[in-house]
Amino acid sequence: MAPATRVVRALWTGGCALAWRLGGRPQPLLPTQSRAGFAGAAGGQGPVAAARKGSPRLLGAAALALGGALGLYHTARWHLHAQDLHAERSAVQLSLSSRLQLTLYQYKTCPFCSKVRAFLDFHALPYQVVEVNPVLRAEIKFSSYRKVPILVAQEGESSQQLNDSSVIISALKTYLVSGQPLEEIITYYPAMKAVNDQGKEVTEFGNKYWLMLNEKEAQQVYSGKEARTEEMKWRQWADDWLVHLISPNVYRTPTEALASFDYIVREGKFGAVEGAVAKYMGAAAMYLISKRLKSRHRLQDNVREDLYEAADKWVAAVGKDRPFMGGQKPNLADLAVYGVLRVMEGLDAFDDLMQHTHIQPWYLRVERAITEASPAH
């Protein structure tokens, strides 16, 4: 297949895998793998709701119901096991972060990858970065899960693959607070297949915004139940709404689309021919796709207005009495929103956002907090 054809095919079928993983068609669903993602600590198949003939809506509802039951099962199992874990822990532990060797497979300009980097940097977790070629994706040929980010965590003799940005963050935060083995933690976030209302197969992960902590551990992280609920709500908002405003804004005009792909090519891992093709053909394709996304998500004629409204809604939720939603330091919602917005830096959409909303002071505070905490990696 010619390089030009491969690039165009990646642009269309991969959509936002090449850019901000938001354009074009949804990523094709790939089989759940053993020991990779959340198929179970023993390496067996994870819980799967198989697609069957019939109503897509009913299939989706049935799969989600099964997922809820599985989530309750895993949560209950965790509650029983947590007491034993707590009793076994030494009063003086080795630094948990030093026991992990982390490798992040990413596209630098992907907002989901940016979320994970923001989390890792703020929590001073050293990690290696492998930039994935968005056309060939040879760097992740070891994985049947073909989206990024993928995080491989080596803990002693145990190696775990974590998929989905929100699951990666929740699992690692649980690990840092509780000290539970990562191999055990990832079983609390089971992968589930379902069919959505459009008849497309999708993979979801149970409990992905929830930290698996006992009551004492939760009190170390949250000031109360309301703070925990608030964090979960806004983490999901970042994934379900904010992230979908990026592509329509950065590809809003032909000029902006070209500038965006110039940045993607410079920051990404492209060959010379692939980069040249991606810059011009990718910009043209994503400009057209951005119009479809505008319609799909029912955005205003001027998509900037939706971006501005989202930013000001977030600022209002943080409020005037605390520097971050997490209080005196960023919580997981702060890091998620920051990570999504950061991918627009250097583009007109980002400059307009800073100029026309009240988000800049908060954004700079998070940036400073991450910079001060971040190790060299």
From Swiss-Prot:
Site features described as Cleavage, chain residue numbers: A87, E88
Residue intervals annotated with topology Lumenal: 1-57
Ranges where the Glutaredoxin domain occurs: 90-193
Modified residues (Phosphoserine): S95
UniProt-annotated location(s): Golgi apparatus membrane
Membrane topology, from the record: Single-pass membrane protein
Pathway: Lipid metabolism; prostaglandin biosynthesis
GO molecular function per UniProt: 12-hydroxyheptadecatrienoic acid synthase activity; glutathione binding; heme binding; identical protein binding; lyase activity; prostaglandin-E synthase activity
Activity regulation statement: Isomerase activity is increased by sulfhydril compounds. Dithiothreitol (DTT) is most effective, followed by glutathione (GSH) and 2-mercaptoethanol.
Transmembrane regions listed in the UniProt entry: 58-74
Residue ranges constituting the GST C-terminal domain according to the UniProt record: 263-377
Gene Ontology terms: cellular component: Golgi membrane; mitochondrion; perinuclear region of cytoplasm
Record-linked Gene3D superfamilies: 1.20.1050.10, 6.20.200.30, Glutaredoxin
Cytoplasmic topology ranges: 75-377
Source taxon at top rank: Eukaryota
Record's comment on post-translational modification: Synthesized as a Golgi membrane-associated protein, and the proteolytic removal of the N-terminal hydrophobic domain leads to the formation of a mature cytosolic enzyme.
Reaction(s) the record says it catalyses: prostaglandin H2 = prostaglandin E2; prostaglandin H2 = (12S)-hydroxy-(5Z,8E,10E)-heptadecatrienoate + malonaldehyde
Annotated binding of glutathione, by residue: V148, D164, S165
Alphabetic keyword roster: Cytoplasm, Fatty acid biosynthesis, Fatty acid metabolism, Golgi apparatus, Isomerase, Lipid biosynthesis, Lipid metabolism, Membrane, Phosphoprotein, Prostaglandin biosynthesis, Prostaglandin metabolism, Transmembrane, Transmembrane helix
Subunit field text: Homodimer. May interact with CEBPB. Interacts with EXOSC10.
Function: Isomerase that catalyzes the conversion of PGH2 into the more stable prostaglandin E2 (PGE2) (in vitro). The biological function and the GSH-dependent property of PTGES2 is still under debate. In vivo, PTGES2 could form a complex with GSH and heme and would not participate in PGE2 synthesis but would catalyze the degradation of prostaglandin E2 H2 (PGH2) to 12(S)-hydroxy-5(Z),8(E),10(E)-heptadecatrienoic acid (HHT) and malondialdehyde (MDA).
Name listed for the protein in its UniProt record: Prostaglandin E synthase 2
Organism of derivation: Macaca fascicularis (Crab-eating macaque)
